[in-house]
Amino acid sequence: MGKVVVFTNPKTVDFELYDDRPLESHEVRLKTLYSGISAGTELTAYRGSNPYLHKQWDPTRKLFIPGDQTSLTYPVSGWGYEEVGEVIELGSEVKDVSISDVIFGTWGHRTHHIVEESYARDRLQARSLDAIFGIFSQIGAIAINGVHDARIRIGETVAVFGMGTLGQIVGQLARRSGAKVVGVDRFEKRLEIALQSGAADVVLNASNTEVAEHIRSMTDNRGADIAIEVTGSTLALQQAVRSVAYSSKVIAMGFFQGEASGLFLGEEFHHNRVNIVGSQISGSDPELTYRWNRLRLIQSFMRLQADGLIDLKPIISHVIPFDDAGEAFRILDEEPEKALQVVLDFTKT
């Protein structure tokens, strides 16, 4: 029997048992080793703010439809997209994957999972990389996608608003792309880690700094060439708009919830011809769509880790036993100043 995390109601975490069915000939069974919790998307389901819980998403017309029907209802099972596991069983015709291979991917906070051989083959983790870092494959792909949307040029100043897990990764990638990165957050610990891990050249605490004015003073009153917003806060988006140069770009990567209060679109946005670009992993920059699919994004990020070009060890703040998943979600929800990447540990389950 396997076990999976379930949200039975907002802020209520439980578990369900499920059967481990026999394998088909080209399938592989994985035992989960670690699973990372997303502080953005997953917390929207945990808190009950996710729009799928309140409206119906029409995938054909790509519209959220108000009404009595919703796309999700509690209990919500199987959430989680930052997993890494070990191969423990092979189908009779599997040739390209071996027992004990480590596979990264997305299968939710569950103890076991079955994948096709091709899925596992495409996501074999380098032996040189500690297994726990496999949890970053998907969020790393999201970060690369956002940096691609930004179209950073060497020598540009990039302001990253929100130095949580995703912001830390975006900052490292932006610096690798030749940018000077200004990291912005309201939690001092995150700013310290951003400097330590190489995610920022300069940091600003938004709780005690007039960010837009400070960034302009750093750039001969020009403003940042690009701002990347990864908080999901409209207040941060407003500051990002205020911080960029005339005719510049803001990449909005955060998952905003509810109505957008705190935006003053008649001010800098209008007068400075600011372009806001939504960045989401379901699609890529149109110019790159032919060459960059999600698998390439994932594999590229894992290669950066294996080659030592990205340092994610400092951003793992908590490793918590899988059976204590409820406490892990509580920490992310109630103590964000203490938490970056929270990881569920299945190795003793």
For the regions a protein language model found, what residue spans apply to each?
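Short, well-ordered loop/turn sites that connect or cap secondary structure elements
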Residues: 96-98, 152, 244
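C-terminal capping/lid region of NAD(P)-dependent oxidoreductase domains
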Residues: 221, 251-252, 262, 274, ...
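C-terminal substrate-binding/catalytic core of Rossmann-like NAD(P)-dependent dehydrogenases/reductases
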Residues: 212-217, 263-316, 327
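Short N-terminal strand-loop motif that marks the start
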Residues: 1-76, 345-349
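A generic structural signal for residues embedded in beta-strands
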Residues: 30, 105-106, 160
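Mid-domain Rossmann-like dinucleotide-binding core that forms the NAD(H)/NADP(H) cofactor-binding site
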Residues: 127-208, 213
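A glycine-/small-residue-rich N-terminal strand-loop-strand element
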Residues: 68, 72-107
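Glycine-rich cofactor phosphate-binding loops and adjacent beta1-alpha1 units
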Residues: 201-277
